[in-house]
Design a protein with these regions (language model features):
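Glycine-rich beta-strand-centered segment in the early N-terminal region that forms part
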Residues: 56-72, 85-138, 183-185
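N-terminal Rossmann-fold NAD(P) dinucleotide-binding loop
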Residues: 227-228
Length: 289
């Protein structure tokens, strides 16, 4: 079950297509946009308080882009930050599962992170913002994920840029950011790319241990949105022996439709030992890998 970068992209595309709508209609993008002088953001100004604030859109540098936000998902991280500010980011414009259309580009930007040609009017999603200065960035420039000081749009405390998260009308893409052209996908599918990529990465990490293959017994504990996507990714990779555990019958039934072989409601068992015995029963005494 060897998986390279191209096959990962195909898997994500297949999973997203099965979970959402089709591709976006092929509409020629205009090359010029009317950009307002000011725009609004949803600023988390204190715990449990979001204010709509308006700021002047700054000039875009040669290595920057201005993106008109078309939509953004709400992640559990956004909820945690809204309730308790565990990362100490306030004031902050949240939103990291977003996508939008490029309306202005600096002269030095011609391609996305994978090398695809880029122009005004293209739709993109963002990933991390490597610092470009730590040891990992300087010695392993092709491994942006290892940056020791990586930033993420939607988790950047308020600064002079102002438009730092997808919970706003516009987003400014900074120099050194990772971003990807996704013109061939509908908005709903684009908003699922980030969580789907997380799931693919998790499966890749599991595969690196040598414990997951086509005949593996896989256990997924919790089938909320991420767990359900993880189920879809594992199933797409050809694994059939999948057991899911959750306390919500509706979610368990949905998991069945997504390809789970066994479903277990943990509320039906008084303790962990009973639950473990049930898992072994449904896997023929083998347990899970």
């Amino acid at each position: 079950m060897e998986i390279n970068q191209q096959s990962i992209e195909k898997i994500v595309q297949q999973v997203l297509s099965e979970m959402g709508q089709g591709t976006a209609p092929a509409v020629p993008a205009p090359m010029q946009f009317s950009i307002p002088k000011r725009a609004r953001v949803a600023m988390l100004s204190e715990k449990r308080k979001i204010e709509v604030r308006e700021f002047e859109i700054p000039e875009i540098g040669d290595d920057e882009m201005l993106v008109h936000v078309e939509g953004c998902g709400i992640c559990g991280t956004d909820v945690h930050e809204y309730k308790n500010d565990p990362f100490g980011l306030i004031p902050v414009v949240l939103g990291h599962e977003g996508s939008g259309q490029i309306v202005k580009m600096g002269k030095n930007i011609t391609r996305d992170t994978t090398g695809k040609p880029l122009r005004v009017g293209d739709r993109i999603v963002t990933c991390t913002i490597p610092c470009g200065e730590c040891d990992s960035c300087l010695t392993m420039s092709d491994r942006d994920n290892l940056c020791e000081n990586s930033g993420i749009y939607g988790l950047i405390p308020d600064d002079d840029y102002k438009f730092n998260g997808w919970f706003g009308e516009y987003l400014i893409i900074r120099k050194g950011s990772t971003f990807f052209k996704v013109n061939d996908m509908s908005l709903k599918l684009r908003l699922l790319i980030e969580p789907a990529a997380v799931c693919v990465h998790a499966v890749e990490r599991a595969k690196s241990t040598g414990l997951i293959s086509f005949n593996s017994n896989v256990l997924i504990q919790g089938v909320g949105p991420i767990g359900m996507m993880l189920l879809a990714v594992v199933r797409t990779m050809g694994v059939e022996n999948i057991t899911v555990v959750d306390g919500d019958e509706n979610r368990l039934q949905t998991a069945k439709r997504f390809g789970a072989k066994n479903t277990i409601n943990f509320k039906n068992y008084k303790d962990t030992d009973e639950l473990v015995r049930r898992v072994k029963e449904v896997t023929g005494g083998r347990g899970t890998d």
